[in-house]
Amino acid sequence: MMDGPRSDVGRWGGNPLQPPTTPSPEPEPEPDGRSRRGGGRSFWARCCGCCSCRNAADDDWGPEPSDSRGRGSSSGTRRPGSRGSDSRRPVSRGSGVNAAGDGTIREGMLVVNGVDLLSSRSDQNRREHHTDEYEYDELIVRRGQPFHMLLLLSRTYESSDRITLELLIGNNPEVGKGTHVIIPVGKGGSGGWKAQVVKASGQNLNLRVHTSPNAIIGKFQFTVRTQSDAGEFQLPFDPRNEIYILFNPWCPEDIVYVDHEDWRQEYVLNESGRIYYGTEAQIGERTWNYGQFDHGVLDACLYILDRRGMPYGGRGDPVNVSRVISAMVNSLDDNGVLIGNWSGDYSRGTNPSAWVGSVEILLSYLRTGYSVPYGQCWVFAGVTTTVLRCLGLATRTVTNFNSAHDTDTSLTMDIYFDENMKPLEHLNHDSVWNFHVWNDCWMKRPDLPSGFDGWQVVDATPQETSSGIFCCGPCSVESIKNGLVYMKYDTPFIFAEVNSDKVYWQRQDDGSFKIVYVEEKAIGTLIVTKAISSNMREDITYLYKHPEGSDAERKAVETAAAHGSKPNVYANRGSAEDVAMQVEAQDAVMGQDLMVSVMLINHSSSRRTVKLHLYLSVTFYTGVSGTIFKETKKEVELAPGASDRVTMPVAYKEYRPHLVDQGAMLLNVSGHVKESGQVLAKQHTFRLRTPDLSLTLLGAAVVGQECEVQIVFKNPLPVTLTNVVFRLEGSGLQRPKILNVGDIGGNETVTLRQSFVPVRPGPRQLIASLDSPQLSQVHGVIQVDVAPAPGDGGFFSDAGGDSHLGETIPMASRGGA
């Protein structure tokens, strides 16, 4: 972890440019996921409402942690979990015990000799529950929907026999908390649980089991009890009979229900997606492998809930679950999944731009218990999408361009300048991120008034604390749209991200500050996500805000601001404007020269004289700017109704020494109109584009058969790229793989080939990235249509194969520019 959440260079305004301290490894966790490290309160201890650990600010965290740990058999998540072959599991058998516990089986006793949960991926249960893609042998079902099982009995089932199914989760299962579920066969259970005999044939009994639509999600132990005139029998617990229960967007009684099949296919079942980055004018996109069905990922998701002891009784509520996930995907407070790092120094971990998916990250966390270095907003969001989709919540990854970060709850973005309109960086704690990525997940909100169901924002990037914890959401998108910042959770912060105003303050001669300009359309200018059933970009800005400048939009802003720390900010507005300013930057590729320009337009009927000042600096995508490396001053005369353009060329050699992550630059433009006193102010962010990787499939792809992909890359820079690392990942195609390829010369073209063995049929995506100290944010993707294996059900039995990390690969060929 970093020195402190506000010490990260590139993340918070006003920080010196210094390398981060290297995080010390967390202590190895115990097998149940708890850390050996003593001291400090756990996540749920800080968040619960019990008398011994209550925090007055912690009312938002839901149920008390009354499910104690420490006795009984646990059904917590095992590491690393079972492998994912699709071979038919044998019927589990056990000797069982009678009511006396002595193991004696009496004549006439109804003994359960075996159980078949019909858990194969090709069986009816998995297909009907839309869980057949999970690379697991265990039964995985969605709550509120029936499933079938077969019992192999010692004799014919009689009407006088009584059979009871039991599901248990946690170390201290209790009926009253829903952690011990008792289901009498043939009788109505409580809370929607019931079991019925479908068919009795000889010693075989076919049962249909109905789960509650409000059931706790997680991995349950399963047992069967029988009672007959000859005595009672209990089937012993068998790990092969553990049952995973997930949220169910297909069940109308589940509060996560989604009433559109195409939405469910996209937001629950799609294993890959697009994440957008860059600037509004220069949008980049990268394909992300969510991999929610990959072997081990479901165990990793449940391990996240276990890691800091989320009460099992609260795991049936998607509001609580999503809020915990938003806290645990980042490492602050609770040693969660990812360590955030915005410094530019990633020498002790992985550059956030190098990740191509969530699988490698989650499996590393599950395997070691250590937080994974490093992540930034799109990585946190990508992992959150994986976790929530895996658990059954319809979730999408959302990008907000020109995303504000309000640090003082004013609900405005305050930017301070000196008397000459030069930015005062030590005062500019608020920042506008070029883009910020979070998540929407779909659920009803019974904890809110009516009208706030549907999409809810969840943000795992650690920006500000909520109830003392670095987490954010779930927050109703509808409350954001209408400026209802008093609705929980964290609505003021998210509203400011999408719909605050940019307020420019100038220092006066007496040291005070005066508002000289308010930019009303600068924040949340475009909010996008991947479209359903395509790789196109969908504009969802209208869901978050009313049309810019409309009465409804202004009312929402002013309503929100009235609840902020500067409720009277709109009482002091600047003078009328008659000179307009437009800022542009030439679209350029990393390594090329570029041009920036400012257009001035005189809308008045009089001559105007404008003193213009341009400051150019590099900037982190978080809005934190570096040193100003070029500036230009010019006085422009404008005739009535005339316009003029001021340009500033920038050579590669001028910006190269100053480049930071994302290749972004910030142009601060300020001006003063001599005749009217009008102040002009504008901040314009742009980025240098990076090249893509070119991927080509060599031959047909068939389940279980080796095929090959070719990757081609041309270095756009005139300098050598050192310590180049490729990453390759694709659900159903390739477990996460790291390829160390050494150096690539300036303007050199390289080609490499990699083989892989598909394990699941259907359309798949193979994703690759390149990273080096000199160049990052380079990635590529190829669609791979995998044919089923001849004469097979389609699945290959090596789905749980190991990842290939740290392999050194020779180049297939090299070429010059």
UniProtKB/Swiss-Prot annotation:
Catalytic reaction(s) noted: L-glutaminyl-[protein] + L-lysyl-[protein] = [protein]-L-lysyl-N(6)-5-L-glutamyl-[protein] + NH4(+)
PTM (free text): Palmitoylated.
EC identifiers of the protein: 2.3.2.13
Outcome following mutation: residue 42 to Y: In ARCI1; skin phenotype consistent with lamellar ichthyosis
Ranges where the record places region Disordered: 1-38, 59-105, 793-817
Cofactor binding notes: Binds 1 Ca(2+) ion per subunit.
Binding site residues for Ca(2+): 499, 501, 548, 553
Record note on what altering residue 212 to F does: In ARCI1; inhibits cell proliferation
Pfam families: Transglut_C, Transglut_core, Transglut_N
Cofactor(s) listed: Ca(2+)
Annotated consequence of substituting residue 396 to L: In ARCI1; skin phenotype consistent with non-bullous congenital ichthyosiform erythroderma
Sequence ranges of Low complexity compositional bias: 71-84
Location of the active site: 377, 436, 459
Subunit structure: Interacts with PLAAT4.
Name assigned to this protein: Protein-glutamine gamma-glutamyltransferase K
Species in which this protein is naturally found: Homo sapiens
